[in-house]
């Protein structure tokens, strides 16, 4: 697997390499209201502000539910040691932080994407809902 090095999806730079420990945050789709997203567009330090805003606990906060939080953990545990090495994580009411290292035959994008797809699909099933569960 070739790693991309520095790249961006138009909003956050990423460094895809097996040689670095990755810190990734992903959030529920409703975790930031429109006004907060507008503030982020103009912020000097958007990542600092993003974390401050997420910690306000906006949205449905489905991750506060133990069964939903366990889905996130199950996603993390699924390929630990095969595609990545999981170092640490914390599950907040409306977002997740995870610290991990990507292994040679996996990529950052595929790894995070698989966690998000698994979590969204199973959480929506558990909650009896459809639609966006996690933000892009």
Question: For the regions a protein language model found, what residue spans apply to each?
Answer:
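Short catalytic/metal-binding and nucleic-acid-binding patches
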Residues: 1-136
């Amino acid at each position: 697997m070739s790693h991309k090095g520095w790249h961006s999806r138009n909003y956050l730079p990423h460094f895809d390499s097996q040689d670095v420990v990755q810190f990734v945050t992903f959030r529920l789709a409703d975790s930031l209201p429109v006004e907060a997203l507008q503030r982020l567009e103009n912020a000097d330090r958007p990542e600092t502000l993003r974390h401050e805003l997420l910690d306000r606990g906006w949205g449905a906060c489905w991750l506060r539910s133990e069964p939903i939080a366990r889905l996130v953990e199950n996603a993390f545990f699924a390929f630990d040691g095969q595609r990545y090495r999981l170092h640490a994580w914390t599950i907040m009411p409306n977002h997740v932080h995870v610290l991990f290292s990507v292994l040679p035959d996996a990529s950052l994008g595929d790894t995070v994407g698989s966690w998000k797809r698994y979590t969204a699909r199973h959480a929506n099933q558990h909650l009896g809902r459809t639609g966006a569960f996690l933000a892009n």
